[in-house]
């Protein structure tokens, strides 16, 4: 199978044990430069809060810095968790980004808080209900449009006026897929950590897709699917490096709060269920190519967005390089 669909990167700005948030951010910017040189299509930053191992909290600031050190790659949010933000502020922030960096900015929007309940309450700014979410998107599009004025209020956002920042809907379930389809917007599926509803979510998105919605901006359904990827020179080395992510998800389930851990002997995970990490491509370039081929054939995805965790930033960058070699 000829791999021809765009390939992108989702970065959560990991903080390895013994390092700092500053070092994690610096490593992410170096990876951004590399991805740009290698021809990746997008670089998106996630939004997470109250986590010791991730520094992707102020997403718009990370986007601005990454855009300033790159030239061609699209840079955006994967995504802004809208319940945490006033929609007007989102319009003003991403309008400013578009003014600073031109037509390379994407705005991915999600309904989840991206954190625990206590932190979500501290951050809460808008409703996560589907109807409110749809209205916020409608207003954001208007703030990015010719008038710069929302549909639901006469408030003007001059900094976002005319910027036409593309909006994506993020989701991990059939419900999220249905919302994206009904809104007539591209859909980014979080299959890299939520594998259970992949096939149904993609089907529902395509079946519910409508170009008649006032929010519709594309003519045909567009799916970007997430997948964990670690490429190394050998299958054995890739499996060893993958244990960093496996430990992270074990920590998540156990409620253990610590930074990203170094790899361990893969035998510690022998026979264990992949669980949330089922959608992963791990191995040598030849192995990963076959796994990606299979995933693209299964999903019919129009684009892949890859997530790579590694304790050592050099290992992550080597994976990004090897993946580019087999893809481009």
Can you describe what each PLM-predicted range is?
Residues 175-196, 201-202:
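A conserved active-site cap/scaffold subdomain adjacent to cofactor or substrate pockets
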Residues 11-26, 80-88, 161-171, 232, ...:
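Active-site mouth loops of central-metabolism enzymes
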Residues 127-156, 197-302:
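An alpha-helical appendage that flanks or caps ligand/catalytic pockets
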Residues 2-3, 36, 63-72, 98-105, ...:
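Acidic (Asp/Glu)-rich catalytic clusters
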Residues 2-21, 83-147, 187, 195:
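Flexible, glycine-rich active-site loops centered on histidine and acidic residues
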Residues 1-73:
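N-terminal beta1-alpha1-beta2 module of alpha/beta enzyme domains
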Residues 7-11, 43-45, 75-77, 105-109, ...:
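Hydrophobic faces of well-ordered beta-strands that scaffold small-molecule active sites
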Residues 7, 35, 39, 47, ...:
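Conserved, mostly hydrophobic/aromatic
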């Amino acid at each position: 199978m000829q791999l021809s669909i765009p390939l992108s990167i989702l970065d959560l700005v990991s903080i390895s044990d013994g390092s700092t948030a500053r070092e994690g951010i610096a490593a992410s910017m170096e990876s951004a430069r590399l991805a740009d040189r290698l021809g990746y299509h997008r670089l998106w930053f996630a939004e997470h809060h109250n986590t010791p191992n991730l520094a992707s909290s102020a997403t718009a600031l990370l986007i601005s810095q990454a855009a300033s050190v790159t030239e061609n790659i699209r840079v955006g949010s994967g995504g802004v968790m809208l319940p945490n933000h006033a929609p007007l502020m989102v319009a003003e922030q991403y309008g400013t980004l578009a003014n600073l960096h031109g037509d390379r900015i994407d705005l991915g929007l999600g309904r989840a808080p991206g954190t625990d309940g206590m932190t979500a309450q501290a951050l809460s700014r808008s409703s996560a209900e589907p109807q409110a979410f749809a209205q916020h998107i409608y207003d954001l599009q208007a703030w990015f449009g010719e008038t710069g004025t929302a549909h639901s209020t006469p408030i003007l956002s001059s900094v976002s006026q005319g910027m036409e920042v593309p909006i994506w809907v993020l989701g991990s379930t059939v419900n999220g897929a249905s919302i994206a389809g009904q809104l007539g917007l591209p859909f980014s599926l979080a299959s890299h950590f939520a594998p259970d509803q992949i096939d149904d979510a993609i089907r529902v998105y395509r079946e519910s897709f409508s170009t008649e919605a006032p929010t519709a901006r594309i003519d045909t359904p567009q799916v970007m699917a997430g997948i964990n990827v670690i490429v190394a020179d050998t299958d054995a080395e890739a499996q060893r490096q993958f244990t960093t992510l496996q430990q992270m998800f074990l920590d998540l389930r156990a409620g253990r709060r610590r930074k990203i851990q170094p790899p361990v002997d893969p035998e510690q995970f022998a026979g264990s269920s992949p669980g949330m990490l089922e959608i992963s491509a791990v191995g040598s370039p030849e192995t990963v190519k076959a796994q990606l081929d299979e995933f693209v054939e299964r999903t019919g995805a129009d684009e892949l967005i890859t997530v790579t965790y590694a304790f050592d930033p050099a290992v992550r960058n080597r994976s990004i390089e090897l993946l580019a070699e087999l893809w481009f």
